[in-house]
């Protein structure tokens, strides 16, 4: 029995000398010390030995077991240290090599355009107001002279959260909230994201940016509206830009109009973008409807006002000659690095 134990010890030593991996170490441990291992089987058979042999063989068996366990432990530690050394060597940074430049981001054209638009209106005395993107039906529709079952609601595919909550389809609700909370004179713009249930294509997106403006005071006329927007267009697109106003209809303004600007592609000569007309629709505007003023407890016999609104994305496309709105939302650095 003692000879068998010595053979097991020597066999384990020889195998451990050629071990190169943790998996091989585990296989050796199982072979000799596992539940069905060679040394374990001997220890289980000690009951068949005589009382004189049992303590002698038990002592030798425990010594062999301890030796194998300690040798495996040392081998495991050596392998672990070698792996660590290899890893550290591979991870070593050669400080004499030139470093890799970090990619530098640029401001998004939407952000640049929004800032330009804000600066222009701030220079004209406008303040910036904000409001929630999840809006009450009252502010998004009813207070803007768009009651339930009004035909204008069918023109805006709306994301409804429930019967009384929507994702705002315009930033006009901010105008209503401002008129409720402030007394005239009011001169404000409301930039922000809006949501429409539109299919994505070159000119439509379910999420886009809009900026609306409102002026309410005594004696405000359509001439004030026209002068403000013409000045904005020249500061935004240059002194050579031409504008014109066309009659239109909006439920919340009366009279209403749309303002066109000379095409940014052909400079008014006529092309595919402007469909040969030389003009591109820029924004909608009009005098605030008397009922909208009444809805905000402002007397239309004393005060009047004008409002306007435009898509910021459209402004970006006009300013930079971009023909596909999807480029603004794809985060393609090849495109964004041009600005």
UniProtKB/Swiss-Prot annotation:
Cofactor: Mg(2+)
Keyword entries, A-Z: Aminoacyl-tRNA synthetase, ATP-binding, Cytoplasm, Ligase, Magnesium, Metal-binding, Nucleotide-binding, Protein biosynthesis
Molecular function terms, GO-annotated: ATP binding; catalytic activity, acting on a protein; magnesium ion binding; phenylalanine-tRNA ligase activity; transferase activity; tRNA binding
Record flagged with keyword Ribonucleoprotein: no
Family matches, as InterPro entries: aa-tRNA-synth_II, aa-tRNA-synth_II/BPL/LPL, Phe-tRNA-synth_IIc_asu, Phe-tRNA_ligase_II_N, Phe_tRNA_ligase_alpha1_bac, Phenylalanyl-tRNA_Synthase, tRNA-bd_arm
Cell compartment(s), UniProt: Cytoplasm
Reactions the enzyme catalyzes: tRNA(Phe) + L-phenylalanine + ATP = L-phenylalanyl-tRNA(Phe) + AMP + diphosphate + H(+)
GO cellular component terms, semicolon-separated: cytoplasm
Similarity comment text for this entry: Belongs to the class-II aminoacyl-tRNA synthetase family. Phe-tRNA synthetase alpha subunit type 1 subfamily.
Oligomer status and interactors: Tetramer of two alpha and two beta subunits.
Protein name according to UniProt: Phenylalanine--tRNA ligase alpha subunit
Taxonomic source organism: Clostridium botulinum (strain Hall / ATCC 3502 / NCTC 13319 / Type A)
């Amino acid at each position: 029995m003692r000879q068998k134990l010595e053979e097991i010890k020597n066999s384990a030593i020889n195998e451990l000398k050629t071990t190169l991996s943790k998996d091989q170490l585990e296989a050796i441990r199982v072979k000799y010390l596992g539940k069905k291992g060679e040394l374990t089987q001997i220890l289980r058979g000690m009951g068949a030995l005589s009382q004189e042999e049992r303590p002698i063989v038990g002592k030798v068996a425990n010594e062999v077991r301890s030796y194998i366990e300690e040798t495996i432990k040392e081998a495991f530690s050596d392998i672990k240290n070698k792996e660590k050394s290899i890893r550290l060597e591979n991870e070593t940074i050669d400080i004499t090599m030139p470093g890799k430049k970090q990619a530098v981001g640029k401001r998004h054209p939407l952000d640049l355009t929004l800032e330009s638009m804000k600066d222009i209106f701030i220079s004209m005395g406008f303040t910036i107001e904000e409001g929630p993107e999840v809006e009450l039906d009252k502010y998004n529709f009813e207070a803007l002279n768009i009651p339930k079952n009004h035909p204008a609601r069918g023109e805006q595919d709306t994301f409804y959260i429930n019967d009384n909550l929507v994702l705002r389809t315009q930033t006009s609700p901010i105008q209503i909230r401002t008129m409720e909370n402030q007394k005239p004179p009011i001169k404000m713009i409301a930039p922000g994201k809006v949501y429409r249930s539109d299919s994505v294509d070159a000119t439509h997106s379910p999420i886009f940016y809009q900026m609306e403006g409102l002026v309410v005071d005594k004696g405000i006329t359509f001439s004030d509206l026209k002068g403000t927007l013409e000045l904005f267009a020249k500061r935004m697109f240059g002194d050579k830009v031409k504008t014109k106003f066309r009659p239109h209809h909006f439920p919340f303004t009366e009279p209403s109009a749309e303002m066109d600007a000379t095409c940014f592609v052909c400079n008014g000569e006529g092309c595919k973008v402007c469909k040969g007309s030389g003009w591109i629709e820029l924004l909608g505007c009009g005098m605030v409807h008397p009922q909208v003023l009444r809805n905000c407890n402002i007397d239309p016999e004393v005060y009047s006002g004008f409002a306007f609104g435009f898509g910021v994305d459209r402004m970006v496309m006009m300013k930079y000659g971009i023909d596909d709105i999807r480029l603004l939302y794809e985060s393609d650095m090849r495109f964004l690095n041009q600005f």
